[in-house]
Amino acid sequence: MGLFDKLKSLVSDDKKDTGTIEIVAPLSGEIVNIEDVPDVVFAEKIVGDGIAIKPTGNKMVAPVDGTIGKIFETNHAFSIESDSGIELFVHFGIDTVELKGEGFKRIAEEGQRVKVGDPVIEFDLPLLEEKAKSTLTPVVISNMDEIKELIKLSGSVTVGETPVIRIKK
């Protein structure tokens, strides 16, 4: 890369030049600080850093282009690796594993290639609001050791559309 290429990349708005990766909302709702999740594993960032979403919709979608890693047997959580190497973990609610799959329906499969917005899991929000300890849904990056900068966004988000996190590797 020559001097002019370097200067051009510094002043360009093109995401490819700046190396910024956007994570899009895997579900609709309101962004909440990860530290406010009523589970120490997420609040203390033991499994990674990120945000949580107080959900308003009925589906979880792929937040990045990539490959579905694991979908829990109870369909309440999934992992995905982005094409750029970001490993994400989306976990609906707290203690939702105890519902043994009630209120969740798997749409995607493990190992499936997905694009941003492709449905992964559908859920019954009224049922889960009644039965789960919390519906706050952590969205965390599990390979934080590879991340240089993490910018957490805030506000209301629309599933498959609104960015929730910006990352520089």
UniProtKB/Swiss-Prot annotation:
Sites of Phosphohistidine modification: H91
Location(s) in or outside the cell: Cytoplasm
Record-annotated site: Important for phospho-donor activity: H76
UniProt: Zn(2+) binding residues: H76, H91
Any one GO BP annotation for this protein: phosphoenolpyruvate-dependent sugar phosphotransferase system
PROSITE patterns from the UniProt entry: PTS_EIIA_TYPE_1 (PS51093), PTS_EIIA_TYPE_1_HIS (PS00371)
Statement: the UniProt record of this protein carries the keyword Metal-binding: yes
CDD domains: PTS_IIA_glc (cd00210)
Cofactor remark from the record: Binds 1 zinc ion per glycerol kinase EIIA-Glc dimer. The zinc ion is important for dimerization.
Phenotype upon loss of function: In mutants defective in enzyme I and histidine-containing phosphate carrier protein (HPr), cells lacking this gene are able to grow on the non-PTS compounds such as glycerol, maltose, melibiose, mannose 6-phosphate, and alpha-glycerol phosphate.
InterPro entries found in the cross-reference section: Dup_hybrid_motif, PTS_EIIA_1_perm, PTS_EIIA_component
NCBIfam families: PRK09439.1, PTBA
Assembly notes: Heterodimer with glycerol kinase (glpk).
Domain notes: The EIIA domain is phosphorylated by phospho-HPr on a histidyl residue. Then, it transfers the phosphoryl group to the EIIB domain.
Protein name: PTS system glucose-specific EIIA component
Organism: Salmonella typhimurium (strain LT2 / SGSC1412 / ATCC 700720)
Gene giving rise to this polypeptide: crr
